[in-house]
């Protein structure tokens, strides 16, 4: 067996063992109950694209503009969080 082929087989075996180990570890851990949380990212005038980007960046969620009672829009971020 050539050295390069031997190296490739070794790397693939190590990678497979690591992946299988991670899968076994993940199966053994209980899932935490997640709920939907909302957060006002900024209360001033909302631009939808900026709001969606900020929410995805900050909380890995989905952002949108919501009009408040005083007819101003705010950036509302919805994301999954742990139940407290």
Curated annotation (Swiss-Prot):
Species for this entry: Arabidopsis thaliana (Mouse-ear cress)
Compartments, record wording: Secreted
Family stated for the protein in its record: Belongs to the DEFL family.
Protein keywords: Antimicrobial, Disulfide bond, Fungicide, Plant defense, Secreted, Signal
Cellular component aspect of the GO annotation: extracellular region
Annotated GO biological process: defense response to fungus; killing of cells of another organism
Disulfide bonds: 37-81, 46-65, 51-75, 55-77
Signal peptide (UniProt feature, chain positions): 1-28
InterPro entries: DEFL
Pfam families according to UniProt: SLR1-BP
Disulfide bond found in the keyword field: yes
Entry protein name: Defensin-like protein 140
């Amino acid at each position: 067996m050539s050295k390069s082929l031997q190296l490739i087989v070794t790397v693939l075996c190590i990678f497979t063992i690591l992946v299988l180990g991670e899968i076994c570890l993940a199966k053994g851990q209980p899932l935490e109950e997640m709920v939907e949380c909302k957060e006002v990212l900024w209360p001033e005038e909302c631009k939808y694209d900026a709001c969606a980007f900020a929410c995805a960046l900050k909380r890995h969620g989905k952002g949108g503009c919501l009009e408040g009672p005083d007819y101003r829009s705010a950036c509302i971020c919805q994301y999954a969080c742990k139940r407290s």
